[in-house]
Amino acid sequence: GFHGDHHSLVIDQPEAEHYRDVPEASAALVPLGALVGARSGDKGGAANVGFWVPELGDGLADLRYSWFESWLTADRVKDLLPEADPLGIDLYRLPNLRAINVVIHGLLGRGVAETNRLDPQAKGLGEQFRARLIRLPSDLIPDIALPLSEDVV
């Protein structure tokens, strides 16, 4: 089955421009939502979050996606959402859409009727992720510079 594995789906994808690694000193502290949009929901006991990098008209969307695609891993999802730590996480990468779909198996227990989560259908989960502060290369999000904190993912 697919549970617990990591998957990528690439169909007729042109070679993407890849973002280089940047030194920590050139990173800015921003909410994840400054980089991506998100929509989330449920499918049985699994929570589903779709992230996408929008086109902002500055020509950096492909580079932002390249950085985000290398940054977002199952372990990073667990860092951003600690209650997902013991759960299976699948990542489905959709480069043509500059999007990544994340499935967190078992986050909702056996489903909406049997979970005690405050957000039983995971409708707010995408915004919960978008509110988390991350270190982003400052040249990908211009004019944002906050002092870095040690407790940032």
Where are these regions (language model features)?
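C-terminal amphipathic alpha-helical interaction region
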Residues: 1-47, 111, 116-153
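C-terminal non-catalytic interaction/assembly regions of soluble proteins
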Residues: 1-23, 27-30, 43, 47, ...
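Generic detector of well-ordered alpha-helical segments enriched in charged/polar residues
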Residues: 33, 65-69, 78, 130
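Membrane-embedded alpha-helical signal segments
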Residues: 90, 97, 107-108, 119-121
